[in-house]
Amino acid sequence: MGLFDRIKGPVFLKESNSLQRQLEALENIKTENEEICQLIQQDIRRLKYGIAGEEKIAFELKNSHIPMFVLHDLHIEYEGLSAQIDYLLVTRSRIFILECKNLYGNIEINSNGDFIRTVQYGRGYKKEGIYSPVTQNRRHLDLIKEIIVNRQTNILKKAAVSKFFYDNYKSVVVLANPNTVLNARYAKKEIKNQVIRADRLTEYIKSVNGSDVLINEDAMERYANFFLSLHKENETDYTARYADMIKNAEPAQETWPADTDSVPLCPKCGAVMVKRKAAKGAFAGNEFWGCSNYPRCRYIINISSGNKP
């Protein structure tokens, strides 16, 4: 049997649907509080964006035809430090640590390595700095290096592993949004080489690996299982904070008939109430009376069903 006769393409040793579970949990939250509904919708949009980005990377990997083991969504803790790794790839010659970014807007990397995003607002444009994903992923890589080096008991081997670590482990930031324009014209080469678009991922892996075959299939699988053994479940509970917010939110104490032209006064502060309509969430489209002193007073009165809107 040839060296890579058994593994013909990517093997997903660990897949993740944690973001999907978080999304479903958020979508199931029900509250009449408009402010909380808006915050929930913001989190839902962020999660959907993240899911779309990771699905794009998964598609590229699954269609790469590259023999490798793929670990998706690893949470590693060591010596008080932690790393949340989007994708870890064990290939025949190198190990790749991928940081998936589904960024909106266009991205510029300047000569200092700063990431600057340009977003269009109406007819104008706004520039804003964002935290460098290269720095973020380098910290993930440094933590893995510390783990790998400290596993070596032989002093000479430990020194060798440390010296050649960055030759064998590669940090890559993958931009998943196909509409994002990347301008890295003035970026230093070492930074530029770590940021690619998703549609170049397969080409990048093949280019870095070249014709090198450094480990066999069994060794690849051992490496993959070792990293899998480091994983610790650490799923973010997006619903917990909303449970507290809903519990502490000012509830509607009464209802108001829909078939009347009279306007109620706020039972809490005495201000005139204003008719509003929930724009999002489980009660989207429902009308209610909200205090005109909002946000200082958050009292609401539900409008009971009737013939008059």
Which stretches of residues belong to each language-model region?
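Active-site beta-strand-loop-beta-strand hairpin of nuclease catalytic cores
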Residues: 89-115
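Basic/aromatic-rich interaction segments and small domains that mediate binding to polyanionic partners
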Residues: 295
